[in-house]
Amino acid sequence: MASNAYVNKIATAVPEHEVHQFYLQFAASMLDAHPHRRALFNRMIQASGIERRYSCFAPAGDPDGVAVDERGNFIRGSFPGTGLRMRAYEEAAPGLACQAVERLLAGEDRSRITHIIVTSCTGFYAPGIDLDLIERCGLSPGIERTIIGFMGCYAAINALKLARHIVRSDSRARVLAVNVELCTLHINETHDLEKLLSFCLWGDGCA
């Protein structure tokens, strides 16, 4: 049994659409009727230190307009249900994850990857993003695969723990751990200050 496991490489990817200021304006507009909460919102955002966040979904031209996104899926007064959001996840998440994997494995012998672990709590579809990554990224069809879902940020820690157990039990194993989240997919209309602040903390990305 191998005594140690190591993180050999790390790669990341973010979508093309920078949306932080747009979402700040959208969130602030939800507090127009609550000036005290809006002032508190602005102070807390300034203290956050966040400058940029990215989304797989292009924002609309006007953050105060009827449509929040360019496609018109998020319309004020009629935000989409879970079904549309999961279809959007299925459309966008594999491509974003594939970008990170391609950066990680550039110039590497991909046949050496024996296991893939994917974590995500912002979307799900079947048969799964793990299969999409295997096909898109040219991984072995015999690779062993696992999805850790709906555990929040802690899922990444569990993925590392599982990878460690795998490598310690088989010294020939090489585990690819992929953490992908589309947090901006779950924006909602609300006047709740805490929820609006949470929308302004998280973005889309993969590591």
Name the predicted role of every residue range.
Residues 2, 32, 87, 97-112, ...:
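Acyl-thioester C-C bond-transforming condensing/cleaving domain
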Residues 10, 119-121:
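Short strand-loop junctions, especially beta-strand C-caps/beta-turns
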Residues 1-113:
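Conserved "HGTGT" condensation-loop signature of ketosynthase/thiolase-family condensing enzymes
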